[in-house]
Amino acid sequence: MSIDAKLVKELREKTGAGMMDCKKALEDSGGDMEKAITWLRQKGLAGAAKKASRVAAEGAVDSYIHFGNRIGVLVEVNCETDFVARNEDFKKLVQDIAKQIAACQNVEYVSVDQIPAEVVEREKAIEMGKEDLANKPENIREKIVQGRIEKRLKELSLLDQPFIKDSSITVEELVKQHIAKLGENIRVRRFVRFVLGEGIEKEEVDFAAEVAAQAGLKPAEAPKVEETPPAPPEEPAPEPAPAAESKPAKKGSAKKKK
């Protein structure tokens, strides 16, 4: 459904919600203004955009260690006052965001607009070089690549991830709900995700040798196999002696019988 820009602007002025949130509310409400306002209030998005420009310098740095101690997260989430920073709803939000980061192994940035230009260009070069686009016209290739890049960049962005506890909203919408609820600007500033052994090339060790070394024993040596010496080369058979030549009998040597 196509939504008139004037309708989006009017809804924004009435609710203080963001432009994209107003557009989505109108689309889901069939263009009905009152239903769209109710939709925004139910989502907790009304009034969030007005507070988003305020300076948020308070907040909390929280951590989360996943079961098994193999994944750890540190995240900084800011709010405007220390009063809200001590609020249990805010603390729960920060902890939920930390758990979200632990669950999202591809996430590297807070939002799409924080992704460096060189990363965007690299992703574009990868997509442009794929074989399935080789025979496509240039204008079609550009549209396909743009769509793929937008999808890929959202995979790298924390705020664009579906919330792990309610996949019907994104992390960004979760934050906006708390902005409306707590009455202050809230923003995820930065985070770091640790994975045990990440980036380390593990040396392969012979398990039997390692156990023997820990026990102070020498690893058993493989039994030596005696090599059979090669047989001497066979001597060639002696050539047969040449046959003796028979001498012709002398004439007149035989006696005649009388």
UniProtKB/Swiss-Prot annotation:
It is found in: Cytoplasm. This is Elongation factor Ts. Associates with the EF-Tu.GDP complex and induces the exchange of GDP to GTP. It remains bound to the aminoacyl-tRNA.EF-Tu.GTP complex up to the GTP hydrolysis stage on the ribosome. The keyword Cytoplasm applies. InterPro entries: EF-Ts_dimer_sf, Transl_elong_EFTs/EF1B, Transl_elong_EFTs/EF1B_dimer, Transl_elong_Ts_CS, UBA-like_sf. SUPFAM superfamilies: Elongation factor Ts (EF-Ts), dimerisation domain, UBA-like. Residues 249-258 have a biased composition (Basic residues). Residues 229-241 have a biased composition (Pro residues). Keywords: Cytoplasm, Elongation factor, Protein biosynthesis. Residues 216-258 are annotated as: Disordered. The lineage of its organism: Bacteria, Bacillati, Cyanobacteriota, Cyanophyceae, Synechococcales. GO terms for molecular function: translation elongation factor activity. Residues 81-84 are annotated as: Involved in Mg(2+) ion dislocation from EF-Tu. NCBIfam families: tsf. Belongs to the EF-Ts family. The keyword Cytoplasm applies. GO terms for cellular component: cytoplasm.
